[in-house]
Amino acid sequence: MAKTPAEKPATAAKKPAAPKAAAAPKAAAAKAPAAAKAPAAKKPAAPKAAAAPKAPAAGLEGATGRLVQIIGAVVDIEFDGALPAILNAVETVNTATGQRLVFEVAQHLGQSTVRAIAMDATEGLVRGQPVRDTGEPIRVPVGPGTLGRIMNVIGEPIDEQGPIRSDISRTIHRDAPSFAEQTNTAEVLVTGIKVIDLMCPYTKGGKIGLFGGAGVGKTVTMQELINNIAKAYGGYSVLAGVGERTREGNDLYHEMIESNVNVDPKANNGSTEGSRCALVYGQMNEPPGARARVALTGLSIAEYFRDEEGKDVLLFVDNIFRFTQAGAEVSALLGRIPSAVGYQPTLATEMGNLQERITSTNKGSITSVQAIYVPADDLTDPAPATSFAHLDATTVLSRDIAAQAIFPAVDPLDSTSRIMDPLVIGEEHYTVARRVQEVLQQYKALKDIIAILGMDELSEEDKLVVARARKIQRFLSQPFHVAEQFTNTPGAFVQLKDTIRSFKGIVDGEYDHLPEGAFYMVGPIEEAVAKAEKMAAEA
């Protein structure tokens, strides 16, 4: 059924095959089976199916080619006329599923052949199958109609709520804004998470990286940021799920409905009007082509809101490492020689093309929060290391801190921010943050002495430093709203002024009389005082 739309071009395309075979002996071997298979492939296509499958390929214009080689996620396509440009989308219909299948042209191989990357599974494709050039890169719907919906890398809805109602579309490959268009503001974005707001404050319109190994809390921290910022902020958000767990994507979709960030279409006659977040998923079960491009799809939606509607947009990407990983998967199939640790030689270029588009202009801003997986907890690995140069703030999640059950497991000594400057965040904030770092650094230096000689060998001054440092460590923990169902502890959103006041009191010694346990998993310092009183009453 699904072959009918391409039947007419296929018969026309096959005419020049005979003279070409004589001229190009190398291609003859590849084309002979294709020529033999083409009639067999055409037989099942009866006139009765002529009208049904036309929708997927409707409105396509451009050269027609045919598949000559299929190697997993990468295919070779031969064209008789003009070749499609690099990054152009070419389409066919998968005969096994009847679904539209999109490829992105990656290389021109010579002999009228291009090599392209598939955006979906290639099982069911056959050599000789016709392919059409769309004449442009992958185009996806953008605008208010995408809010509250989930789409895939090529802009198709995957939330079973019908087609996306949007008359506006954009291609996913675009140039970054020029220097003249870009703006650079230094305004603190309050997250409500104490350790982030104090030690590595985020900037509105900046790029933020959440670095961490497997299982240290990147996704949960990002979900809390979505909950705190997207709800309090009230603007538009875009979430790009790049190669992460489908379960987490599903949970996030329902959490957004429960927290009123998005509208439940089932309770609103199928409408998502009033929603404030668009979701774009290319999860870990997707082919590498989809995972390598889904971040660009999400970014295109965010760029529309920034450029055309003048909005300040939040862009969440989970996980930017999978974007790199997907590129590495197809790199060898494209014939590229791998670079360090097996990554693609174009790693820095691909990362730069993505990151340079995530910026603020004189029309609006994009504030980006990106989870970045760190393989084997090695921050010098080329994938996370390439991201560092593009970020305004880095929040490093530590396995050692997670092992102490301190969540979020942010390392206050490793995490940095470009706006950690008294001229931007204020003198008091800067002074308190640096004093907290000094206490923690002194404690870190004393740990070896404590391990060998014990606490008794420390001076009274050092004992005081250790006591305050341990209280600070525990006070940097915080109950999350998104983890309430697991911890049975209500989440806490702490205002920046309360965070600064609380830590100032600890380093000044105002709370030296409180036990360490009172500082664990609380919001502002008042909760720690109340917890200490409760502990004393129960003792």
From Swiss-Prot:
Gene Ontology molecular functions: ATP binding; ATP hydrolysis activity; proton-transporting ATP synthase activity, rotational mechanism
Pfam families given in the database record: ATP-synt_ab, ATP-synt_ab_N, ATP-synt_VA_C
PROSITE patterns referenced in this protein's UniProt entry, alphabetically: ATPASE_ALPHA_BETA
Protein's UniProt keywords contain Transcription: no
Record's subcellular location: Cell inner membrane
Membrane topology: Peripheral membrane protein
Subunit structure: F-type ATPases have 2 components, CF(1) - the catalytic core - and CF(0) - the membrane proton channel. CF(1) has five subunits: alpha(3), beta(3), gamma(1), delta(1), epsilon(1). CF(0) has three main subunits: a(1), b(2) and c(9-12). The alpha and beta chains form an alternating ring which encloses part of the gamma chain. CF(1) is attached to CF(0) by a central stalk formed by the gamma and epsilon chains, while a peripheral stalk is formed by the delta and b chains.
SMART domains named in the record: AAA
Name this polypeptide is given: ATP synthase subunit beta
Enzyme class: translocase
Keyword terms: ATP synthesis, ATP-binding, Cell inner membrane, Cell membrane, CF(1), Hydrogen ion transport, Ion transport, Membrane, Nucleotide-binding, Translocase, Transport
Family that this chain belongs to: Belongs to the ATPase alpha/beta chains family.
Primary site of residence: membrane
E.C. numbers: 7.1.2.2
Any one Gene Ontology cellular component term annotated for this protein: proton-transporting ATP synthase complex
Binding of ATP, residues: G212, G213, A214, G215, V216, G217, K218, T219
Region (Disordered): 1-44
InterPro entries: AAA+_ATPase, ATP-synt_VA_C, ATP_synth_F1_bsu, ATPase_a/bsu_AS, ATPase_alpha/beta_chains, ATPase_F1/V1/A1_a/bsu_N, ATPase_F1/V1/A1_a/bsu_N_sf, ATPase_F1/V1/A1_a/bsu_nucl-bd
Xref: CDD domains: ATP-synt_F1_beta_C, ATP-synt_F1_beta_N, F1-ATPase_beta_CD
Reaction catalysis annotation: ATP + H2O + 4 H(+)(in) = ADP + phosphate + 5 H(+)(out)
Function text: Produces ATP from ADP in the presence of a proton gradient across the membrane. The catalytic sites are hosted primarily by the beta subunits.
